Amino acid sequence: GKWMSLLKHILK
């Protein structure tokens, strides 16, 4: 679940 937020931040 936490990875989702991290990935989104990196992708953005």
UniProtKB/Swiss-Prot annotation:
Cellular compartment(s): Secreted; Target cell membrane
The entry's keywords: Amidation, Antibiotic, Antimicrobial, Fungicide, Immunity, Innate immunity, Membrane, Secreted, Target cell membrane, Target membrane
Tissue spec. comment: Expressed by the venom gland.
Domain of life: Eukaryota
Transmembrane feature ranges: none
A GO cellular component annotation in the UniProt record: extracellular region
GO biological process: defense response to bacterium; defense response to fungus; innate immune response; killing of cells of another organism
Main location: secreted
Record-listed Lysine amide modification sites: K12
Biotechnology: The synthetic analog S5T (with the Ser-5 replaced by a Thr) is a possible anti-leishmanial therapeutic candidate against both cutaneous and visceral leishmaniasis. In vitro, this analog shows significant anti-leishmanial activity towards two life forms of the dimorphic parasite, the free-swimming infective metacyclic promastigotes and the intracellular amastigotes responsible for the systemic infection.
Function field: Short linear cationic amphipathic alpha-helical antimicrobial peptide (AMP) with potent activity against both Gram-positive and Gram-negative bacteria, moderate activity against the yeasts C.albicans, S.cerevisiae, C.glabrata, C.krusei, and C.tropicalis, and low activity against the yeasts C.dubliniensis and C.parapsilosis. Minimum inhibitory concentrations (MIC) have been tested on B.subtilis (MIC=1.0 uM), S.aureus (MIC=11.1 uM), E.coli (MIC=2.6 uM), P.aeruginosa (MIC=15.8 uM), and the yeast C.albicans (MIC=6.6 uM).
Recorded family membership: Belongs to the lasioglossin-like family.
Miscellaneous comment: Many analogs have been synthesized to study the effect on cationicity, hydrophobicity, alpha-helicity, amphipathicity, antibacterial, antifungal and hemolytic activities. A decrease of hemolytic activity is accompanied by undesirable decrease of antimicrobial potency.
Name this protein carries in UniProt: Halictine-2
Organism from which the protein derives: Halictus sexcinctus
Lineage: Eukaryota, Metazoa, Ecdysozoa, Arthropoda, Hexapoda
